[in-house]
């Protein structure tokens, strides 16, 4: 839990001023030619600060840890962070993936702030920014030129060429935005972004029963489900289950819930001897990095919650059960508390495979680990 809170830092001073470094030119993952500005925090009619401004590591795939855990333990934080992220966009046009020194880093991919902001609103926690303004800001960032990083090809074909990982992320983010549109009564926007969230289906490969990357001509990039090419720090075995918004559809494509769970169970059996800890893009299941952090909970969506219970226990004991860096967090990508957040959720027996981003958020209940 200490790591879960350590990853965010206030950047505003006691007088309410904060640095704005959003005005500059993108150079790869960073920004150059920055024009530094000093801005002032918003205040209410009584002169009280409405919200603070924050730095953080990227919110990449935090729908499976921080978005859920913050709402349970520190419900003010999703509200604070959402308002801060929207303020960044007000200043510089883009919603940060991970705000750094008052500006952008472009580290990781997509618009990972969307599930965080949507979950804050759909759980009734958004108080410090206007929901409609937040929605319009995210909508702008889900179009070409926005932080989601999509182009016209994605809008036309539904998938990111040569990258199944980015497709899975973008589709989930589009689904999350559609869920907020439902709550706001924006039926046309809900339908539009909902339709965009189905593109991953074009990457389903029947002969492998997994999602694989395709190029612009619709050709598969490779045949190896354990190869990381076309994924982001993952592979087909790890990333396929990340279509959290449409797991029943994935099960149907695989031939039904029994085959769906049988395939996932095989992956866990293969990963268990290595304690579910692998390097980027390696192994069948990895709890050393973000892309697989929901996988053990997926069995519940396949009608076999006892397998979720079994593998959650195994993962929590083997991957997160130690007290040293190489045993407690898989010796890998803890980032801003994400692996610690997954372990905490496993221990308290609560999770949300959809990151509490649904129009009616749902928690999955497991047994408490004493």
Where are the regions that the model predicts?
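Catalytic cores of carbohydrate-active enzymes
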Residues: 96, 178, 184-292
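Function-dense linear segments that define catalytic or interfacial modules
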Residues: 1-54, 74, 123-126
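Glycine- and aromatic-rich loop/turn segments at beta-sheet edges
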Residues: 34-50, 90-101, 145-161, 205-225, ...
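Catalytic cores of secreted or luminal carbohydrate-active enzymes
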Residues: 303-318, 334-365
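Aromatic-rich carbohydrate-recognition surfaces in CAZymes
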Residues: 55-181, 194, 237-252
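Extended, well-ordered alpha-helical scaffold segments
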Residues: 76-86, 127-142, 186-201, 256-271, ...
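Conserved small/polar residues in nucleotide/adenosyl-binding loops
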Residues: 369-370
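Carbohydrate-binding/catalytic loop surfaces
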Residues: 102-117, 153-164, 211-234, 278-295, ...
């Amino acid at each position: 839990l200490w790591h879960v809170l350590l990853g965010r830092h206030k950047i505003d001073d006691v007088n309410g001023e904060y640095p704005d470094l959003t005005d500059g030119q993108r150079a790869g993952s960073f920004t150059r030619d920055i024009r530094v500005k000093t801005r002032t925090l918003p205040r209410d009619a009584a002169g009280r600060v409405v919200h603070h401004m924050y730095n953080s590591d990227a919110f990449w795939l935090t729908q499976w840890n921080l978005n859920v855990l913050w709402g349970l333990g520190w419900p003010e934080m999703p509200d604070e962070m959402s308002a801060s992220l929207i303020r960044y966009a007000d200043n510089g046009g883009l919603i940060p993936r991970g705000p750094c020194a008052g500006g952008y880093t472009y580290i990781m991919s997509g618009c990972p702030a969307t599930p965080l902001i949507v979950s804050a609103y759909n759980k009734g926690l958004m108080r410090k920014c206007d929901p409609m303004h937040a929605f319009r800001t995210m909508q702008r960032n889900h179009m070409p030129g926005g932080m989601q990083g999509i182009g016209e090809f994605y809008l036309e074909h539904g998938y990111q060429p040569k990258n199944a990982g980015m497709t899975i992320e973008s589709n989930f983010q589009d689904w999350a935005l559609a869920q907020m549109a439902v709550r706001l009564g924006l039926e046309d926007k809900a339908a539009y972004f909902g339709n965009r969230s189905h593109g991953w289906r074009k990457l389903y490969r029947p002969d492998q029963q997994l999602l694989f990357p395709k190029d612009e001509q619709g050709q598969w990039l490779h045949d190896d489900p354990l190869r990381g090419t076309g994924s982001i720090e993952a592979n087909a075995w790890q990333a396929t289950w990340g279509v959290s918004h449409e797991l029943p559809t994935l099960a149907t494509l695989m031939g039904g819930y029994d085959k769906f769970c049988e395939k996932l169970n095989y992956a866990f059996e293969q990963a268990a001897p290595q304690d579910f800890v692998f390097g980027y893009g390696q192994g069948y299941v990895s709890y050393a990095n973000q892309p697989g952090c929901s996988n053990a909970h997926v069995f519940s969506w396949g009608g076999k919650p006892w397998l979720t219970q079994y593998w959650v226990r195994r993962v929590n004991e083997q991957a997160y059960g130690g007290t040293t860096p190489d045993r407690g967090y898989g010796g890998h990508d803890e980032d801003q508390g994400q692996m610690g957040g997954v372990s905490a959720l496993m221990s308290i027996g609560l999770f949300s495979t959809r990151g509490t981003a649904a129009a009616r958020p749902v928690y999955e209940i497991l047994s408490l680990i004493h």
